[in-house]
């Protein structure tokens, strides 16, 4: 299993599937469709049934039931795209066997070092096989670890018919990282009663609470005048954007929050004197606080427009997804089954809120309750991203055990 996981994973991460927020098509990048087609071929090769990919890049496939029992159809999902925070082009995965617990030099020329001093959690991976970046790209374990684990789990179940299970549906979705994953996902065609995303982090993570999420795009329209004659005429759009940001509570940012605390996050600020654009994401687990955060953004935008004149500040504020806890708690047994599966494999479940989003958040509101299971990765969305091969083995085993337990309980 280890060898298959390593082979598939290092193949998948080399396909550039970074999504593109600015694109209006689906999938937003050609690389996602390229990987989708690779997976379709491989799914057919291992013996999966009803293998399809649609024009939008959604891959679906079926592992038929091998039991006489009436077992609910369950699904497992992962996303094709990688994050936009750092390039996903020309990913060169580095394999470090029997990690010694010390610094890992990812890139000597650029002096990029993955160090336990900066990332103390590395200590728990001593003796494990770590897969890292070369210090110039992200790795893409989010979520190609999940894709790999689903592929290997399905292959294992096909080759071990003695493990009884009901019908299993799997799906690989595009554009999760920009919040569009479930937009064109056909829940009815997928046909599962419950599903799980393999999109979590370290070993044992199990999540069924997510943020309420919104995005704010703000355009500041200034007035560019020659600096020599600018008095009482120039309006600097960049300074307007800075003034806006000064009204956002500094302590309520990702770098100062954890647990159930929400935040405002300035993703980007670009512009010049004439025009500047800021992009924020807004996150909170509590719906009332979520609404308050959006109201604050809108209020600051309105007040700045009143100060600088009509049309000087343009705000586009839209909701992205909501806390899935409301939809999963009524069927909490689907979380309990995963907890039991983990314990059967000597994994201690670590149930915590997702400080992020998964396709499961939106799918749960579309009628498909979808908790999130660990994929094994750490430090997602950056050059220090890595995954332990042993954690991927455990995640694969959890998929298999969940399928077995659903059949056993009927």
Swiss-Prot record:
Any one GO cellular component localisation term in the record: cytosol
Key word Cytoplasm present: yes
Positions annotated as active site in the UniProt record: 81, 176 (proton acceptor)
Single Gene Ontology MF annotation: zinc ion binding
CDD domains the record matches: M20_peptT
Name under which the protein is recorded: Peptidase T
GN (gene name): pepT
Protein family according to the UniProt entry: Belongs to the peptidase M20B family.
Keyword Zinc set for record: yes
EC number: 3.4.11.4
Binding site for Zn(2+) 2: 142, 177, 381
Cofactor(s) required, per the database record: Zn(2+)
Principal localisation: cytoplasm
Record key words, sorted: Aminopeptidase, Cytoplasm, Hydrolase, Metal-binding, Metalloprotease, Protease, Zinc
Catalytic activity: Release of the N-terminal residue from a tripeptide
GO terms classed as biological process: peptide catabolic process; proteolysis
Record function comment: Cleaves the N-terminal amino acid of tripeptides.
């Amino acid at each position: 299993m280890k060898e298959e996981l390593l082979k598939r994973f290092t193949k998948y991460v080399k396909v550039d599937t970074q999504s593109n927020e600015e694109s209006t098509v689906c999938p937003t990048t050609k690389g996602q469709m390229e990987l989708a087609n690779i997976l379709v071929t491989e799914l057919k090769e291992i013996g999966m049934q009803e293998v399809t990919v649609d024009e939008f890049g959604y891959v679906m496939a079926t592992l038929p039931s091998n039991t006489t029992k009436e077992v609910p159809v369950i699904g497992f999902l992962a996303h094709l795209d990688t994050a936009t925070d750092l390039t996903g082009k020309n990913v060169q995965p580095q394999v470090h066997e029997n990690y010694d617990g010390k610094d890992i030099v990812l890139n000597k020329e650029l002096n990029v070092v993955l160090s336990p001093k900066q990332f103390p959690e590395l200590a728990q991976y001593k003796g494990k096989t770590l897969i890292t970046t070369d210090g110039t790209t992200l790795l893409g374990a989010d979520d190609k670890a999940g894709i790999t684990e689903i592929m290997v789990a399905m292959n294992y179940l096909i080759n071990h018919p003695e493990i009884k299970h009901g019908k299993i549906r799997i799906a690989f979705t595009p554009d999760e990282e920009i919040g569009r994953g479930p937009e064109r996902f056909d829940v009815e065609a997928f046909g599962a009663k419950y599903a799980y995303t393999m999109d979590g982090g370290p070993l044992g993570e199990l999540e069924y609470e997510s943020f309420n999420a919104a995005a704010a795009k703000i355009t500041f329209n200034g007035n560019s005048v020659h600096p020599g004659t600018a008095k009482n005429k120039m309006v600097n759009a960049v300074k307007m954007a800075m003034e806006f940001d000064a009204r956002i509570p500094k302590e309520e940012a990702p770098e100062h929050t954890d647990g159930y605390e929400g935040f405002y996050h300035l993703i980007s600020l670009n512009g010049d004197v004439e025009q500047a654009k800021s992009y924020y994401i807004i996150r909170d687990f509590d719906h009332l606080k979520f609404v308050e955060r959006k109201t604050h953004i809108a209020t600051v935008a309105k007040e700045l427009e009143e100060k600088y004149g009509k049309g000087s500040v343009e705000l586009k504020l839209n909701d992205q997804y909501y806390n899935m806890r409301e939809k999963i708690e009524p069927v909490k047994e689907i979380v309990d089954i995963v907890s039991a599966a983990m314990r059967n494999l000597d994994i201690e479940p670590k149930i915590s809120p997702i400080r992020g989003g998964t396709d499961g958040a939106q799918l749960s509101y579309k009628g498909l309750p979808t908790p999130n299971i660990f994929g094994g990765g750490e430090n997602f969305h950056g050059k220090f991203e890595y995954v332990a091969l042993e954690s991927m083995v455990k995640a694969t085993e959890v998929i298999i055990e969940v399928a077995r337990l659903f059949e056993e309980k009927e």
